[in-house]
Amino acid sequence: MHDSAPQWLAGCRLRECWFEPTFHKYAGKLCAGVQIHVEDSAYDHAAFRPWRLQALAFKALRHQQPAYPLWRDFPYEYELDRLAIDVINGSTLLREWVDDAQAIPEDLDSITRADELAWEEERSGFLLY
């Protein structure tokens, strides 16, 4: 993740963590994960982009483990015809970017920037500070 888009890691600190789930298929097994810290000196509200951070994590996982079943393929929120990731994101855009081995972070930036600017303008009248 650091190599492909270090700017997407700005505003937070990532730290390896280990945990032992108490239920489901990994119950009692030591698992590894990533903890996202946003409440210390590394936090920068203007720089932190959580959606991009998660997109980059998906992309890194797809790169390292191409055959890993990243996307849930069973009904989600009463949706029978769309994948959960597409429902959550409102389109196929994120999933298609992650699954495209040739796509780079700048591609996702260029696709999403217009919508982000429109959202910033639309919400600006409602911000109190």
Please report, for each region that a protein language model flagged, where it lies by residue:
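Generic, ordered loop/turn and secondary-structure boundary motif
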Residues: 89, 127-129
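Conserved functional hotspot residues or short segments at active or partner-binding sites
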Residues: 1-109
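Flexible, low-complexity junctional segments that flank or bridge functional domains
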Residues: 109, 113, 117-127
